[in-house]
Amino acid sequence: MNLNLIFKEQTLKFNKEEQETYLFLQQHNSDWANIFKEMILQGRDKVTQRLVTSMHRENLVKARTQSKKILSRDLIMLDISTTHILEIQFPQAKQTLYAPITGEHAFDRIDIEGPFYIKDDITNTITRVHHPNEILEYILIEAPDLKNAASDQFQQDLINSATNMTFAISYQALSMQHDSAPLFNIIENSEDSYLRSEQAVIEGHPLHPGAKLRKGLNALQTFLYSSEFNQPIKLKIVLIHSKLSRTMSLSKDYDTTVHQLFPDLIKQLENEFTPNFNFNDYQIMIVHPWQLDDVLYSDYQAEVDKKLIIEAKHTLDYYAGLSFRTLIPKYPAMSPHIKLSTNVHITGEIRTLSEQTTHNGPLMTRILNDILKKDGIFKSYASTIIDEVAGIHFYNEQDEADYQTERSEQLGTLFRKNIYQMIPQEVTPMIPSSLVATYPFNNESPIVTLIKRYQSAASLSDFESSAKSWVETYSKALLGLVIPLVTKYGIALEAHLQNAIATFRKDGLLDTMYIRDFEGLRIDKAQLNEMGYSTSHFHEKSRILTDSKTSVFNKAFYSTVQNHLGELILTISKASNDSNLERHMWYIVRDVLDNIFDQLVLSTHKSNQVNENRINEIKDTMFAPFIDYKCVTTMRLEDEAHHYTYIKVNNPLYRENN
C-alpha cells in the first residue's frame, strides 16, 4: 500500500435542516443545542454506517466485489481503534472508502463504525467523511443510471435521517446524563415498562439508512410526535358521517366495540354536543393532531363545511410508539393501542393507513385466533397474537378511483388490544427492538442484562451457556408461531423486532411472545383456502394476498430470522469473547426449527391436511447454503418500495449434512 498519504482537514458545516434544528434547540434548551452541535458528526456517521453496510452486503455498485479487508496499521495516520478496516473501491469516481470493522456476522454482515475516511486516488489525499451523501455521490458516479428522481429523493432522505439521528441521540445524552444503571433496569423500574421500552429505541431501524426519516415534520413537530422525546400527545376525536365511512370489527359491530373500548367517551361527547345532535348518524374516528392540522382541514374542508366531519373538543392522552403512527396510552390506562394515518415519510414510505389495513385487521385476527384455538401444534409454544379489534376509514363513493384511494388512506383508525390486558402482573413487557438498545452512560443492552440475570437465577457457570439457553427459549416461542402458520396455512407474519411484544420473567427468561400488526403480512391465498379459510371477504385492494410462494416465504424468513433473531444473536455475540458463540446460537435456532418441522410432520399425519412435500420444500429453502436477503438501499434507489429486491447471502442455518 502506498503510504505517502496526505490527511486533509475539513471545516464542519451545518446543512439547512441541521441549522433549523439547531436554531429550534437554541430557543428551546441551550444545553441541548450545544450537545446537538457536538454530536453532529456522530449522528451523521450512524446513517453513513447504515448506508455503507447495506451497499456492501447488497453488492450495490459492486461494493462487495470491489472491497477487501486491510489492517488498520496500514493507515497509521488515521485514529482507528479497530484491527481491520473495510476498503471499498469506487473506480469511476477514483475514490477509496475506509470503514473501521467492528465485527463480521451471519448473513454476510460486516459491522462498521465511524469515523469513515475517503481517499482521492489521484492526489492520495485522505479526508474524513462528513455526511452520508458523500458516499451516495460516489454510488451515482459508479451507476449513473440510478441518478433520477428516486436518488434525488434519497439524497434528501439521508439529510433528514442524519439530522434526526443527531436530534435523537443528543436528547438521549441530555435527558439520561444522570443515569448509569443498565437500560433494562431503567425500563423494568418504569411506571410503564412497555412504553419506556418503545421510547428507549433511539436510533430506529438498525440497518436502514432512512432509520430516522421524518420528512414532512419540522423540528418542533418531530420533538412533539416522535417516541424518543417522550411527549404526551392529545389525539383528536372526529365524528364522521356514516355515509362517508367503512368499518370492520372483530366480534360486535364497530360502534359497540368503540363504546366498549372507551366507556366514558360517549358520555363526554354527549355533554359536548347539543341534545338534538344525532350520534346515530356518525361514527367515531381518532385522528393524529398532525394529520388533523396538515391534512384534514385542507383535503376534507368541503366535508367539514357540510358538518359531515366534525372535530370534537375532547381529546385522548397518548404517547408515540417506535413506529410513530402507533399510539399507546400510559399504564395504568387500559384503552387500546391505536394505529393512525400520518402523511409523514418514515423509514422508506409515507405512513398513511391503507383501506385494506383497517378492513383486514379484524378479519385476520378472527382467522388467526381460530387457527390457534383449533390446531394443537400451537399449544406447545409460548406465543400468540394481539387482536386488531376494529377499524374505520374515510370512504366517499363519489370520489374517482385514485382520489378515492388517497382520501381513504389519509383518514383511518385501527384499534388494537392493550398489551396490559393480556399479561400477568409480574412480567416485564418490552418491544424486542429495545433488547439491542443502549445509551451513552451504560453500554449494556437489555438482552445482555436478561441473560446475566438468567445465569444468576439458574446458577450457570458462564455467560455463553446461559445465552444459548436463553436463545433456545426465545426462538422456540417466536418460531413456534411463525413457522407452522407459514408452512401449514400460508400465512407469513411480519414478526420483526418492531412487530412483537415480549414479556420477561424475573429470572430473565422469556415468558410469552406476542406478535402484532397484520398490515405487512403475506398470505399464500391458495394454501389458506385449501386449509378451509375463505379470503373472499378480504378487501378488494388487498396486497397481502398473493400467489407467490417465494414472496410469502421471504416475508416470514426476513422479518423473523434475519431481522428479529439476527439482531438479537449479533448483539449477544458482541458481549462475549467467544468467537464461536454466534455460530453455536445459530445451531440452536436450527435445532429449534428442525423440531418444529418434525412436529409439523406428525400433525400432518394426524390431520392429513398438509402435503409433506410442502414441508420439505420450505425446509429445503430455509436450510439452503444461500438465502435471499432484502436489499433495502437498492430498493430505495430503484424506487421499488413494494417490489422487493433480494441478493443471495450465506445462510447460518445451513448444515452440510442437512
Language-model features, listed with the residues they occupy:
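Nucleotide/phosphate-binding site architecture used for ATP/NTP-dependent chemistry
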Residues: 2-476, 505-658
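Conserved catalytic-core segments centered on acid/base and nucleophilic motifs
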Residues: 470-506, 513-514
